[in-house]
């Protein structure tokens, strides 16, 4: 994580000067201007390799919205969460002398998340996304709040953010921990050490932030944590998908798949199916493994263009929604045209449905991979004996491990069940909608854990099939075979597979291996959108 001190990049100097300062310090810069952040920028921000710089024009819009907000308060208007309570307390108005205390304590009342803290990279994303959505200029908070979030980023300072406690209609229980830490309450991470927030800020050269009216609500009433979790999980899903496409292609080549279905998809399929058909045809030809001698392929081979295309469509669609949400203002109230208005923008239903859709599409991909594993091991394909046990060899072979494939698929399928429709009403009936976005993302992340293992198992089975058939694949299939053989010797007798499968899974899920597999058989637009090649 970058250890830049806050004064170097406070976001308060001119944008161009701040970028030049970043370059002079030997780091890059990501400009936060209230516009969507792509996956390359998100990855650099999460890793702390680039400084975050506030665009001055965007900051001026924040200041203008703040002026309009203060004018509304000065007129005597009641403004939700500023001079009134929140939730079921919306009709309560604190006295003028209690207003400062009310705002200071508001973040504490909402700092109730529990569970294992989020990783530093994801927490950094939450800070960056909250700052960026403020910079759209509709929040009504002080410019200093956006500056302070960016100062934390550039100091390598992150709040300890426990992730359980959001209904997905503004992550108040999660982001409340951010607001509390900014004020000096709670814990923070600095240089890998968990410290009391006050001590961490002192070491980083920062002072506690005193929330002005609306600053407390702006700090906590945001889906920034859910969007951060979403971008991280969807970005990971893109890599896992590319790995599963590679292992699926290798398994298909080992099974002697026929070229006709991919060619048919290039002409008769949807645009995405046609693209995937071309991808399969090219990668399959590059493998230099001859097709089988049969009339018809089983569906798990024949329908790969359709299954792969659906997964690519779903994951890319989720990624595009997530990127848009890195700039979408989800505050309530909001400032529009100088007026303070109530808003329902804190319901990220489009993103939640996109995440759930991606998980469901990946469940279909999991079934497809499991079925290919079964197909190869069953011994019904010419040249591939039962359990991949070569004649004259004393082995049980790969039959038993198919039970692992079955459970991994079942886990993914179970996690693909939607959670966003769960009914719930809180806050004395005022809050009767929910998306459970963080829970939906957690399901996707756990599904990806299972999918990484399933990809490893399919790769191991494909490699064994190549070996028993005496085939030496080239191209993408050859990359998969080589990746397996770096970690697991060919099977000459039965042995424990647990550690091998886990090691192969870790290798195939590594950024470097994902980039290598993608370069061997590019899916150019998809790979560029998700910055897959940046992983190398």
Language-model features: where?
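FAD-binding core of FAD-dependent oxidoreductases
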Residues: 80-105, 109-134, 160-183, 193, ...
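Short alpha-helical scaffolding segments that buttress acidic/His motifs in well-ordered protein cores
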Residues: 42, 106, 110, 122, ...
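FAD-binding glycine-rich core of flavoenzymes that anchor FAD
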Residues: 137-166
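Conserved SET/PR-domain catalytic core that frames the SAM/AdoMet-binding pocket
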Residues: 76-78
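C-terminal auxiliary extensions adjacent to catalytic cores
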Residues: 3-50, 54-61, 65-73, 99, ...
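Short secondary-structure transition/capping motifs
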Residues: 54, 58, 91, 95, ...
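Acidic, glycine-rich active-site loops and adjacent beta-strand->loop/helix elements
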Residues: 86, 112-113, 132-133, 153, ...
